[in-house]
Regions:
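Short hydrophobic/aromatic patches on the structural cores and recognition surfaces of FHA
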Residues: 20, 39, 58-60, 79, ...
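A residue-level structural signature of the nucleotidyltransferase/glycosyltransferase Rossmann-like core
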Residues: 8, 52, 73-74, 105
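Cyclic-nucleotide recognition modules
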Residues: 74-129
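A small-molecule sensor/coupling module
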Residues: 6, 22-24, 93-94, 111-156
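Long, low-complexity, intrinsically disordered segments
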Residues: 162-168
């Protein structure tokens, strides 16, 4: 795949959408390209995450460990960024990623990403704005869940009172 194609894929990733073409070019040029065969593991659940992986070709199965072994939770393909948070802070991989077919990725190490942010501080502000917006959306989406849980807790408390009255 050409550098221009890599840049086009990177540009479609929401976290990188505010990057200018020259910034994406620098990122793509400095990142590491890796190929995986069908069935090969990109990473395991619990592995230390030192950056993000952008899928440029192929399909990846994301799996989590359950009581009966690993279970597929999602299949992702071209243009997916795995490990967005790992670009900014150290953490562990929340799932296993396995190549379903031939897969090519761009590996962006955290150190490289942080250098980009230091070099272009306006990117950090835009990413912060994006994260705040996503956080607000998540909070508002969870509000009805919280209300429903409070409602259920109230019903449960009322039921306990009635049960206590019957036993008395």
């Amino acid at each position: 795949m050409s550098l221009a194609q890599d840049i086009a894929i990177l540009k479609r990733i929401p976290m990188l959408s505010d990057f200018q073409d020259d910034q994406l070019r620098l990122l793509a040029f400095s990142a590491e390209s890796m190929d995986y065969s069908r069935g090969q593991r990109l990473f395991d659940q619990g592995d230390r995450a030192d950056g993000g992986l952008v899928i440029t070709d192929g399909t990846v199965s994301l799996q989590t460990k359950g009581a009966d072994g690993f279970e597929e939770i999602e299949q992702v393909g071209q243009g997916t960024l795995l490990g967005e948070t790992a670009l900014l802070t150290e953490n562990k991989r929340p799932c296993r990623a396995e190549a379903i077919d031939a897969v090519r990725i761009i590996r962006i190490r955290r150190a490289l990403f942080k250098r980009m942010i230091q070099e272009y501080p306006e990117l950090a502000q835009r990413m912060l704005d994006q994260r705040v917006s996503r956080f607000r959306y998540t909070v508002s989406a969870l509000k009805p869940v919280g209300e429903k849980m409070a409602e259920l807790e109230q019903l449960n408390a009322e039921r306990r009172v009635k049960d206590d009255e019957r036993q008395s």
